[in-house]
Amino acid sequence: MAIRLYRAYTPGTRNRTVSTFSEITTDKPEKSLIVKHHFCKGRNNRGVITCRHKGGGHKQQYRLIDFKRNRHNIVAKVASIEYDPNRNARIALLHYLDGEKRYILHPRSLSVGSMVLSGPTAPIEVGNALPLSSIPLGTAVHNIELRPSCGGQIVRAAGTYAQIVAKEGTFVTVKLPSSEVRMIRKECYATIGQVGNIDASNITLGKAGRNRWLGKRPTVRGVVMNPVDHPHGGGEGKSPIGRARPVTPWGKPALGVKTRNPNKYSNPYVLRPVNRIYFIKNLMIYYYVKIYT
């Protein structure tokens, strides 16, 4: 994937970058694999906002992605590589020998015409899905299951991959893109290779309108609100938040507070948690600069 730059002939194109979409081979999705996508706009069944900053955006049709890869020992051919508006990775359309069609996440370097296979005896090639017990150490994988036969849940974003570190007993140790090291059952499936569209993180939106196209609404700082709307609000002129530490709109501590449940069931499987100190420090500096400047 390459990135296209724009000349600064308008303020909206001054810092705007977009993908060239050079890897896309067709602009029409498979009709049997798309369903209507209903936008909740951050509301629950009573119409109450439960997730702020959501709403609007372009209409989208959801592509049914095969995260389970449970068509074992049936060869499939990559028919096309397509754009998916619901994720930053590309998707690949597979045509199985028995006539079935399915979408999968497009791994890097997988091209049209390639053959992919899923199963314990599949070769170690990009796009093939195997149980973790059958994958050699040091192999890059993505779309990893956390529980057998439940479908891939982690390492699905564009450009990401995990690495097989060790095998012991009924578990396989995997190093995730966040630097977390955790154990996963050896029966869980994963796909060989790195997710494609590796330059997705280098895209610059360039203007607020592109965020609105994505269904993201503006985020207003609490310090500029009224006291009735946010604990940081109020004061005469430009004033500080008036508290010992930042809080959420509902008065709970924010920025630097651990949100993971200390009794979470998966804690014993995490051998090395994510080192969040560096990220939290930078995040707090960023928000304090926004609040006081």
From Swiss-Prot:
Gene3D superfamilies listed in its UniProt record: 2.30.30.30, Nucleic acid-binding proteins (2.40.50.140), Ribosomal protein L2, domain 3 (4.10.950.10)
GO biological process, one term: mitochondrial translation
Annotated spans, Disordered: 224-245
Compartment(s) where it occurs, according to its Swiss-Prot or TrEMBL record: Plastid, Chloroplast
GO (cellular component) term, any one: chloroplast
Any Pfam family the entry gives: Ribosomal_L2_C
Signal peptide: none
Keywords recorded for this protein, A-Z: Chloroplast, Plastid, Ribonucleoprotein, Ribosomal protein
GO molecular function annotations of the record: rRNA binding; structural constituent of ribosome; transferase activity
Subunit field text: Part of the 50S ribosomal subunit.
Protein's name according to its UniProt entry: Large ribosomal subunit protein uL2c
Organism: Pyropia yezoensis
